[in-house]
A protein has these predicted regions:
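Glycine-rich acyl-CoA binding loop
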Residues: 100-114
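Short, internal active-site loops enriched in acidic
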Residues: 131-138
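Non-catalytic substrate-recognition and accessory regions of acyl/acetyltransferase enzymes
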Residues: 1-101, 116-128, 142-175
């Protein structure tokens, strides 16, 4: 799976919602009530077309998740950070079509895509990744271990927030 910008025509929010509507209705869920609330932010951001801060996790055939990614300065960091938040996942994950293991794999793939962005097109040495819930932290707990092979000089999970810093030598290799 790859994290890609949401763009017309095949990765537009409209196209993704169409796919997710079919997914929800395939298990008898009323999409109009299922999507109320959580989809509103994306509807607003895409009202006038593509929005540069929106990304989707795709396997080439389907979109599994979407999130907002921003590169910004924060006072507690000396350089720009990458912030990923407002994660929405396909109804197949929320309605039990996919199992917990598949959900975990998708969330890890999404985080991996954010790390890739931080080393490539949206260069940043610090990442703030807002999980869907504190329960998702279990999928990332092993990354808190301080090992020589780790990409991270710091990796913390507080509630539903992952904060991590890439090792400087890792950043230099991508420059």
């Amino acid at each position: 799976m790859r994290l890609l910008p949401m763009k017309e025509p095949d990765r537009s929010w409209r196209s993704i919602k169409g796919q997710w509507k079919k997914d929800a209705e395939s298990v008898g869920e009323d999409f109009s009530t299922f999507s109320t609330g959580s989809f509103t932010a994306y509807d607003g951001l895409t009202k006038e077309g593509d929005h540069p801060s929106l990304y989707c996790l795709s396997d080439g055939e389907r979109v599994h998740a979407v999130c907002q990614v921003s590169r910004l300065m924060m006072s507690k960091f000396p350089s720009p950070i990458l912030r990923a938040r407002f994660i929405l996942v396909s109804p197949v994950y929320e309605l039990g079509v996919a199992d917990a293991g598949q959900y975990a794999q998708m969330m890890v793939a999404l985080f991996s895509g954010i790390v890739w962005l931080s080393r490539d097109t949206m260069t940043a040495s610090h990442i703030r990744f807002f999980l869907k819930s504190p329960g998702d932290a279990q999928f990332f707990a092993a990354l808190q271990a301080d090992t020589s092979m780790s990409l991270f000089s710091k990796f913390t999970i507080d509630g539903a927030l992952i904060e991590c810093s890439l090792k400087e030598d890792e950043m230099a290799e991508t420059a």
